[in-house]
Amino acid sequence: RHAAEAAKIMGKYQEALRQQLNDAGAFIGKQDHYITRQSHDPIRIKGDGSPAAFDAWRDFILPRLDPITFRDAPNPEQMLRNIYNNLKTGVHTTSTSDTLAGFSGPANLAKRVSQERVLIFRDADAWFDYNAQFGRGAVADSIIASLEKGARDVALMRQFGTNPQAMLDGWIDRLRTAARDRSDDATAKQLGSKFPNQVLAVLDGSAAIPGSATLAQAGATVRALQQLAKLGGVVLSSLPDLAVNAAMLRHNGIPLFHAYAREMTALIPKGPETQQVARALGVGIDTLLGDVAARLGTDEALSGRISRATNLFYKLNGLAYWTDAMKRTSGLMLASNLADSAARAFPDLPPRLQATLRRYSIEGAEWDAIRAAPQRTADGTAYLLPEAVADADTARKLAAYYADQVREGMTETTAGVRAMASLGTQAGTPAGELVRLLMQFKTFTITYMTRSLGREFRRDGIDAGGLAHLIAATTALGYLSMTLKDLAKGRNPREPDDAASYGKLVAAAMVQGGGLGIYGDFLFGEANRVGGGFIGTLAGPTAGSIEGVQKLLSAARGEGNAAAEAIRLGVGHTPFVNLFYARFGLDYAVIYRLQEWANPGYLRRMEQRVKRDNNQTFWLRPTEAVR
């Protein structure tokens, strides 16, 4: 019974998505009992790359397809071969490819999405059989991926028309011509940059088409394993989110003290009515979507097991709950703020709120439509929801406002940042995978610099008050994060005793609060928290891992302590071991004992080094714990 109810709900929203795609320019026919598109794993489909791989795929899928699949195909064999060639390269995952069933011509998004339901399976058992053999993830994963991709296609067609690349090229050509006509050579040269096309490639998914599906999957797996081994304490580094969120809310006309007061209650579960409002706003559901890692800049197509392990990891380390709670609170505050402001005309709104709304093309007429909408009350608080706005276009603008402002407050990456971080390279190529390994964990910092700090510098001139608040608040919360991480390591808070050590402490807190937490320890002369050096950290965690392997090999040749290096490497690369609460117990119960066994006197020297470099002691000394 529950499965049937779930299928009806999914069918309802798939049908709504189909209608939105058609309204945007596609021509997708209605298919009875349609629930979701089939997922396809390029690596499984490609097999060994031989002609026999196509034969195996064709022989498996053909008896499971409904004959209606080939109703307009004069040559079913050729149709399947065309589909196979697209599936094995991953082209089917993008919004620009135009040939799923053998069509040709310029890339046309409307035509592309209209071909998405080419493979029609005979029944549910046939769908599941194919998914188990050549698909990726469970049916729920496929449903969410289908809705996400459909929403992306709708957004692209609404903004860029049915041929996004041609539309973008046309805009750029017209702007360059205008710049040349007014002899503005600098602007004309800037418009010749490849960056706009690189951003579009991220938006439409073509940047993720792997040059080699095997290489792309290997790189994605390595990066996922680095997350599982390195980010166990990331929630302790997330306290500066409070300041970044408050700064965003300030630019929406919400006083700072009110923002902080509401944020302090963010982790307290909300009532069912308020949770329904948050869901209607589309905020605080990252855990449900398996998308918590997105705020760290990850954008990987992971295999089912690795994906499930990653989602579990972020639940266990607390980041999933923290992210959902913070986004839910921010979204509710924005919606409540607009409801409270509904009695005012647009010119009477706070100037910062006006400026922010204008970024989403919300001005006098749109604001009048929004404030005329019926408000929804939950647990005694009124909210303005997009679904209540009568004009569909204005409702979409309001929804975009809520979603983007919440993402800005949580320092989530944008398409521009992802394009910048990938340097325009393609996934699954040697250069592309190298860049992605080097840039792992750095997109968060780039986003903070460009979105949060950039907002205070560039929007309507320098906002001195906003800049001062952001720096001071993130520094204070950065220090609190450092202190919590020290306590989790068994150490007392750092105690500077002169001007130089105070300066180092403030600088490290600024770095921690500004999104560079993994580099903060180096200002205290320490290696990073997993034992790698500064160069290894700058070059990405995988470079640090290679550095660790090199040290182990050198030690095995008699140039060091092989047992100690093996312990350090193993601890730093075992998934889930670095969960901050588990790591504390493991350190004192097992790891410190192993390190002392492998390198007698190691713990005493570590305590002395921490005292010498940081003037810091332990509230639970490792040397006492191993006696």
Language model: regions and residue ranges:
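Short linear, low-complexity motifs centered on an aromatic residue
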Residues: A24-H40, H251-T265, R455-I462, R557, ...
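Hydrophobic alpha-helical segments
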Residues: R557-R627
